[in-house]
């Protein structure tokens, strides 16, 4: 079984600032994951040519189960509101997606608490402080029928605000307690090193720096396990043709 997580930067390539869905398709084919967690996923956004990037990825990997969960309704960086899951078809949205080559038994969605007020954020380029609203955050959880039995997989993209992302991760840990099956938590947790494993009590399946893309120095993207699966055969953080993150991949026996 191959697990992978990838923050796709809404399909954008940093080098040329272009969103070309075919690049995402090729990247997903190259990852060749059985279960794939994606973050920063666009649907019906003008900046990504109104493409459904979840559908592009699902077709590329041959997924039989996929679920997109919008965190934002509208356009990130412009006019938006927190998504509710009741948006009309065709509404521009942005969020996370979970895809699998295994049949899904059920889906669940958890909306995470967000900072209720605006807060200052330092931009390295240009060097200035701006006041922003924190983006809404969500978790998509799938329970899949795998050859070794039911497997629960959760995908999320946590806040970049130190401390707040820890509270969100603790909320996820409590939410996942109800499952008796092995649980995999994947995603861009915006926390480096062993902090996510220490906060959750989960086992890290891969330890590779994933950010920034060219010469990564921090592991912001994680694949964590509670319970027992097959042993890890290999893991990697491959350079992909898009995004500002590397993907994170784990192969299990």
Name each model feature, range by range.
Residues 1-96, 151, 166-171, 191:
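N-terminal, active-site-proximal structural segment of metallo-dependent hydrolase catalytic domains
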Residues 100-147:
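Active-site catalytic loop in hydrolytic enzyme cores
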